[in-house]
């Protein structure tokens, strides 16, 4: 890109002066190639120094992004002599260097030293610096296996270790903890070499780290090393939204941010979101998606972002104009939202975040990472939901999520208000908590009469839930919201068993059980036993009975909503229209007397909005655009 240095530096100057960006980082792909390894740092830093000189003259600080250190795994032009990553679960070799290899450590240390000699204002280590957050679930090369066997006093092969961990018995758990420790320690040791290279030139240069994976895989330790002595610790979380084919499932980026921020336990000084538009044009990511992504990342706890707004594969400046315009317009919006978010108390449907990070090493571990309620149902219905280890509201669990929590934590859930889908209820029963659910759960045989539909009380019917199980009440106190029926002869509805039940247990809690699964493929045969207005009314009644529904959108638009108490007793409501229909006005059911409704504006100010009231229905006289986040303050 050197031939476009004038245009690029002018663009950077515009971004910094207009609050679009604070500091540009120049990408350096250092994953070694060749034997001996090519000195990529020398080649790339020479180019960076040309840009840095121009930016220094403009008074603009700049830094370096070590975009690849051990490698993201893509095909290389030439192999290096360093030990390669060997997949833990499949034994395959990847185009990734093992961070235990002493030769590689010296290579990356010298590379960091060369970058530091250019006097960057910041050095960020990118998220290829990971081992378990890959499809192969860790490095089991000879170096890593030797470290593991030394730690445990064993002589296991990769295959034997993987088999033991998959069993998940006492020995398997011991080996799991040791394996995780060895993987993280190898990264931490390598990060120390990178920092040593920087410190050998200038120990005051600040650094940061980009983590990858919900488990946060040693992120705070690595970020603390990269920061350098007496510098703030900064971590970029891994909540990218590359090439999203649809606004649907946007909740995944929220959940990833929330999970990683929880795993970091408040330790870093700064947390940045990954609002990367990769591959950096609007055929991949719209400016609206970028704005929504940044907005909801702030609501999950990010204090800024590592943006990537510029095409780097080729010089295509027009591809970033809409991104810059959107971010510049909303600078005040982001700053005000960042100011008020830390003092919010979240309300509504609570997706609990485990207190201990969940490392996905085996196929069984994948089942723990449920996304049913938050990414298939609640995110479409305009019912407030939040991801949190704390906060208020009814706890929603699906799949095998119970395995992420201790017995004590499950009892705490059961002592409050909890909603389980059929798979989650099975997990609670297997753990010995069946008596608190009020029902037994049985998987049905395919030869049994099919579940044609569901009667929703007090009136209405719809398709049966996906993957429905049979619920059998265990107490006269078990109440039912629905019944599953078999349609006989195309006319007769033969009721078979309850579809949704509620039970007040001896712990003082109320447990709602759905017979089906909240996780399903999005298709007309699978999704619409859940995604319909009758089911939405069913959920509204349940949440109203539980007393956990302070506000909601009552109609059939695809609305994602978050709600929270403000520190002065007001109500914040964050709304995202995920459908393709602009709403001319916004109806809301609000369970409180409302004096005013204000909108957070792009410049950070608040605009009063007009509304009409009819009982609990408040109709806000303001349009809601497609994928345009709306932040309301309701007093």
Model-derived features: positions:
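A structural motif corresponding to the C-terminal end of an alpha-helix
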Residues: 18-19, 51-62, 114-121, 189-207, ...
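Conserved, mostly hydrophobic/aromatic
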Residues: 108, 115, 123, 198, ...
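Catalytic domains of carbohydrate-active enzymes, especially glycoside hydrolases
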Residues: 5-32, 114-122, 233-234, 292-304, ...
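A conserved amphipathic helix/loop scaffold
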Residues: 369-370, 375-376, 380, 387-390, ...
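Active-site-adjacent "subsite" loops/lids of carbohydrate-active enzymes
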Residues: 61-119, 127, 131-135, 148, ...
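Hydrophobic targeting/anchoring helices
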Residues: 26-29, 132-135, 197-373, 449-468, ...
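The substrate-binding groove and active-site-proximal loops of carbohydrate-active enzymes
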Residues: 1-3, 29-45, 90-109, 171-189, ...
